[in-house]
Structures are given as structure tokens and as C-alpha cells.
């Protein structure tokens, strides 16, 4: 359990693996919507995380994300594509989290910022609106596509001249349609090769194709601060709160504060008071110990026994 640093100051067991801070659900939705967030106990077990989407093996920061009620994070386009391949008569319980097999739809009686954000995202697609009990929305009409079989060579020449005129006035940036590379995204779940994004840029001179490839790999984050400098400045870093400390660290801190030269008059009076207090306690402790041992030796001393003294006669009068 930890305390979130937001103005609400809520106690939470959620821990952001990227920023290494405790976060509540309000901060999770507003400031950590693309961060890996799980329980703090899981962070103590692993102390590592994978910043990539488990469906397409691409960084989570590259696209819009969706967080389920189990706090697993995916690309919204990947989860939508995966759920769209399910049969139309699939029950709401049939849509499960790809990681933990938990439910995709939040329970109806669950009221939390994460559940509200998830319902808002799911309400934008038909397969999820059916599971949420909402009416379906009409699909937008698909754009008309041209085919090579129904045109002649004269029509193609006319089309090429008109496309050049349009490109001179409004240059366009097009990409491959999502239905062509939808299967390629989910085939990469067992491969480590990155996806290639292809942009077709139409200009007046020629058609240039630019291929952008990004490769990322999860890496551990190490602390590169200067330990000597941070120990002198005594700055409260977030990582220091979760670092293991020796058992007598508090005693060393007290000695360091007592031996510090940058103390004011109030600190000097406090030190004198502590010395006097310890001296009085030690003095009374010594007196009690000496009195106890002295009384015990007097009780066993034969010289102090009146029955063993020849000068003292005790008898019947």
C-alpha cells in the first residue's frame, strides 16, 4: 500500500512500473494512460516490465491504448481487430483478456474511473455495444475502390492526368488500408520482427514510397545517480522510498544528526537536554542495582545473624 502524490492523497496498491510511483485510478486515467500499472506486490516480484503491446509487439506509446478492468493495457486498434474476428453470436463472457483471460466488459455494478473510461471506448464499436446492452450504430459506408478489370487504356490515361492535377493542388498522404495488414499484426505474436509502416506520397513528379521501420526492445531501467552527491544533498527521490535499507540505518541517521556541525542553538540545547536525561537515568539505575546486590549480600552475611553472635543470649526468661 502507498499514498498517491496527487491532491486527492488516496491510499492505493497500484504502482506505475514506468515512473515507479504509487498511483490512484484517477491519476491512472488522466496521467498514466499509456503506462504499465499493476499491484505493488507484482513489482516486488518482477521489478521489470514489457513496454510493448502483447498483441502486436509494438510500443504502447505509438498508438491509442485501452485498459481493461484487470489493468492490462493494449493498443485499441489491436484489441478491436481481435474482437472483430469473433462470431457475431458470441456471448459477452466470450470476450476475454488475451493476457489473463479475464472479462473484457466491466461489471455493471462496478463504478471506477478505469471502468468508466473502458465503457466509453467500448461504446464506439458495435461488437462491444451489444455486450454493454446498447443499441447498435450504423456502420459508415465503405469508400468506393477502383478495379483494373473494368477500365480501358484510354480511361487509365485520363485518370493519370487528372490525378496529377489534383496532386498539384492538394498533396495527399495515404497509407495501406487496415484490412490488408490486419492478419499480419496478429501473426507477429509469435515473431520478433517489427511491423513496417508504408506511406505512399503522391507528388507531381513521381510516386515515392517511404518505408519506416521501428525496432524496440524492453530494457531494464537502472539508477545512474551519483550516490555520494545524493547522500549529501538528502533529496527525497521516488526510487529511494522502495530501496532496501539496513536495520540500523535509523541509528546511523541519529548519530549523523548529532555530530553535524551545521546546528543552531536550539539543536545544541536539545543535545544538552538529552545528555542530562541519559545521565540521570543511568545514575538512578546504578543506585538501584547497587542497593539490590547490597541487600542480598547482607541477608547471607553470618556476622549479621544475631543467633550466631556469642554475646547475644536468647532464651526463656
Swiss-Prot record:
Membrane topology designation: Single-pass membrane protein
UniProt KW GTP-binding keyword: no
Lumenal-side positions: 293-317
Transmembrane segments: 272-292
Keyword annotations: ER-Golgi transport, Golgi apparatus, Membrane, Metal-binding, Transmembrane, Transmembrane helix, Transport, Zinc, Zinc-finger
Chief place of localization: Golgi
GO cellular component: Golgi apparatus; membrane
Zinc finger annotations (RING-type) as residue ranges: 53-101
Any one of the GO BP annotations: vesicle-mediated transport
InterPro entries: ZFPL1, Znf_RING, Znf_RING/FYVE/PHD
Subcellular location: Golgi apparatus, cis-Golgi network membrane
Metal-binding as UniProt keyword: yes
Zn finger (B box-type) location: 1-43
Family of the protein in this entry: Belongs to the ZFPL1 family.
Protein name: Zinc finger protein-like 1
Organism: Danio rerio
Lineage: Eukaryota, Metazoa, Chordata, Craniata, Vertebrata
Gene name per UniProt: zfpl1
Amino acid at each position: 500500500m502507498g499514498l498517491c502524490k496527487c491532491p486527492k492523497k488516496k491510499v492505493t496498491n497500484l504502482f506505475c512500473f514506468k515512473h515507479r510511483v504509487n498511483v490512484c485510478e484517477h491519476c491512472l486515467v488522466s496521467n498514466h494512460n499509456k503506462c504499465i500499472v499493476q499491484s505493488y506486490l507484482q513489482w516486488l516480484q518482477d521489478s521489470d516490465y514489457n513496454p510493448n503491446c502483447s498483441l502486436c509487439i509494438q510500443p504502447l506509446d505509438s498508438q491509442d491504448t485501452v485498459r481493461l478492468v484487470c489493468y492490462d493495457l493494449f493498443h485499441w486498434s489491436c484489441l478491436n481487430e481481435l474482437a472483430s474476428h469473433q462470431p457475431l453470436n458470441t456471448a459477452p463472457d466470450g470476450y476475454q483478456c488475451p493476457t489473463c483471460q479475464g472479462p473484457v466488459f466491466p461489471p455493471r455494478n462496478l463504478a471506477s474511473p478505469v471502468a468508466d473510461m473502458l465503457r466509453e471506448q467500448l461504446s464506439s464499436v458495435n461488437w462491444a455495444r451489444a455486450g454493454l446492452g446498447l443499441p447498435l450504430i450504423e456502420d459508415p459506408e465503405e469508400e468506393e475502390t477502383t478495379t483494373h478489370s473494368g477500365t480501358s487504356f484510354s480511361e487509365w490515361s485520363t485518370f493519370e492526368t487528372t490525378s496529377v492535377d489534383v496532386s498539384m493542388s492538394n498533396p495527399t498522404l495515404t497509407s495501406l488500408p487496415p484490412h490488408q495488414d490486419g492478419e499480419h499484426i496478429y501473426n507477429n505474436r509469435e515473431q520478433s520482427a517489427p511491423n513496417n509502416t508504408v506511406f505512399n506520397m503522391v507528388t507531381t513528379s513521381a510516386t515515392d514510397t517511404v518505408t519506416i521501420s521501428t525496432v524496440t526492445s524492453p530494457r531494464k531501467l537502472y539508477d545512474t545517480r551519483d550516490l555520494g552527491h545524493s547522500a549529501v544533498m538528502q533529496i527525497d527521490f521516488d526510487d529511494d522510498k522502495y530501496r532496501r535499507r539496513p536495520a540500523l540505518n535509523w541509528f546511523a541517521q541519529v548519530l549523523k544528526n548529532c555530530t553535524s556541525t551545521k546546528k543552531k542553538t536550539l539543536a545544541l540545547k536539545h543535545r544538552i537536554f538529552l545528555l542530562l536525561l541519559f545521565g540521570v537515568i543511568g545514575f538512578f539505575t546504578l543506585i538501584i542495582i547497587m542497593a539490590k546486590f547490597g541487600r542480598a549480600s547482607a541477608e547471607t552475611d553470618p556476622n549479621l545473624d544475631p543467633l550466631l553472635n556469642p554475646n547475644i543470649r536468647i532464651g526463656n526468661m
